[in-house]
Swiss-Prot record:
<keyword id="KW-0004">4Fe-4S</keyword>
<feature type="binding site">
    <location>
        <position position="156"/>
    </location>
    <ligand>
        <name>iminosuccinate</name>
    </ligand>
</feature>
<feature type="binding site">
    <location>
        <position position="297"/>
    </location>
    <ligand>
        <name>[4Fe-4S] cluster</name>
    </ligand>
</feature>
<keyword id="KW-0662">Pyridine nucleotide biosynthesis</keyword>
<dbReference type="GO" id="GO:0005829">
    <property type="term" value="C:cytosol"/>
</dbReference>
<dbReference type="Pfam" id="PF02445">
    <property type="entry name" value="NadA"/>
</dbReference>
<protein>
    <recommendedName>
        <fullName>Quinolinate synthase</fullName>
        <ecNumber>2.5.1.72</ecNumber>
    </recommendedName>
</protein>
<feature type="binding site">
    <location>
        <position position="200"/>
    </location>
    <ligand>
        <name>[4Fe-4S] cluster</name>
    </ligand>
</feature>
<dbReference type="GO" id="GO:0046872">
    <property type="term" value="F:metal ion binding"/>
</dbReference>
<dbReference type="GO" id="GO:0034628">
    <property type="term" value="P:'de novo' NAD biosynthetic process from L-aspartate"/>
</dbReference>
<dbReference type="InterPro" id="IPR023513">
    <property type="entry name" value="Quinolinate_synth_A_type1"/>
</dbReference>
<keyword id="KW-0411">Iron-sulfur</keyword>
<keyword id="KW-0963">Cytoplasm</keyword>
<keyword id="KW-0408">Iron</keyword>
<feature type="binding site">
    <location>
        <position position="113"/>
    </location>
    <ligand>
        <name>[4Fe-4S] cluster</name>
    </ligand>
</feature>
<feature type="binding site">
    <location>
        <position position="68"/>
    </location>
    <ligand>
        <name>iminosuccinate</name>
    </ligand>
</feature>
<comment type="similarity">
    <text>Belongs to the quinolinate synthase family. Type 1 subfamily.</text>
</comment>
């Protein structure tokens, strides 16, 4: 598998950590959010990687906790006229693409994603233009502009199946933006894959030697790994999969202890699924390095109770997602291709 570009040369500045709230303040904002959701005919959709108190609030108010695509699909089917998206900006864009008639609000539009930041549209479009014989497949963790440049959008849950399908048709692939997921898919399928060189700042930090030491401490533990992790981590795994697939694996594996190599935000729903099991964080520090993300996306952490309340109350340019109509049409085509393909897998 060839490599052409290394956006990892860029260091993305992290946002400041949110100011902690007192218990009284948390209760105040929880009640305010519940009231505002009713007043605005809104529903809250939260990603697995948001903080536990945010996921809990989404549950309590009849919302959704899931991966980015299922968040958008839930919102599209829901009767609410407004969606409050607790996640990062590309998730709000995806929701707007699938529900253009709805108001899409976010706690902050400054919640970025290193995969999105690492795949700027101008550079990526030039990369695609240099390889016109290849089918362009992009991960859901990309901007609306990058999606519109692609032939297919894909989630980690069906990435292997889609690339197998395209390979069976004799197609050569451009994969973007996550190099680790692209490498995993290529090894699983044997397809001709040309990879963009982005990475998730959370999964890229997992350390092999530190994980080996942890496995010695917990020799009977199973290792669950998201395929955005480095190859050396994936090769150690007992189960590899998307967020929803890892939760399913936690339920089906017989092990009583689980080491989890993905954002620790997933622990909220995973522990609900397996309350009898012990969940352990895979190490992101060690081997001469300290952690930057420390197994939690700093932009996901921006989705606090106060910010959610402000997003619902204020709306406007600081909180509302807008997607240009022409760009939306361009991004909707590869998204719909993926949805149709996923439907054939479920049939």
């Amino acid at each position: 598998m060839s490599v052409m570009f290394d956006p990892q040369a860029a260091i993305y500045p992290f946002p400041p950590k949110p100011t902690p709230l007192s218990d009284d303040e948390k209760q105040f904002y929880r009640e305010k959010i519940k009231r505002l959701l009713k007043e605005r005919n809104a529903v809250m959709v939260a990603h697995y990687y948001t903080d536990p108190e945010i996921q809990q609030l989404a549950e309590e108010t009849g919302g959704c906790i899931s991966d980015s695509l299922e968040m958008a699909r839930f919102g599209a089917k829901h009767a609410a006229s407004t969606l409050l998206v607790a996640g990062v900006r590309f998730m709000g864009e995806t929701a707007k693409i699938l529900s253009p008639e709805k108001t899409i609000l976010m706690p902050t539009l400054a919640a970025e994603c290193s995969l999105d930041l690492g795949c700027p549209i101008d550079e990526f479009s030039a990369f695609c233009d240099a390889h016109p014989d290849r089918t362009v497949v992009v991960y859901a963790n990309t901007s609306a502009a990058v999606k519109a440049r692609a032939d297919w959008v894909v989630t980690s849950s069906i990435a292997v199946e889609l690339i197998e399908h395209l390979d069976s048709l004799g197609e050569k692939i451009i994969w973007a933006p996550d190099r680790h997921l692209g490498n995993y898919v290529q090894k699983q399928t044997g397809a001709d894959v040309l990879c963009w060189q982005g990475a998730c700042i959370v999964h890229d930090e997992f350390k092999t030697q530190a994980l080996t030491r942890l496995k010695k401490i917990y020799p009977d533990a199973a290792l669950l790994v998201h395929p955005e992790s480095p190859q050396s981590i994936v090769e150690m795994a007992d189960a590899v999969g998307s967020t929803s697939q890892l939760i399913k694996a936690a339920k089906t594996l017989p092990h009583r202890q689980l080491i989890v190599a993905t954002d620790r935000g997933i622990f909220y729903k995973m522990q609900q699924a397996v309350p009898e099991k012990e969940l352990l964080e895979a190490p992101t520090a060690g081997e001469g390095a300290t952690c930057r993300s420390c197994a939690h996306c700093p932009w996901m952490a921006m989705n606090g109770l106060k910010a959610i309340a402000e997003g619902l109350e204020q709306g406007g340019a600081a909180h509302e997602i807008q997607v240009d109509a022409a760009l939306r049409e361009g991004a909707l085509l590869p998204l719909n291709r993926m949805l149709d393909f996923a439907a054939t897998l479920r049939a």
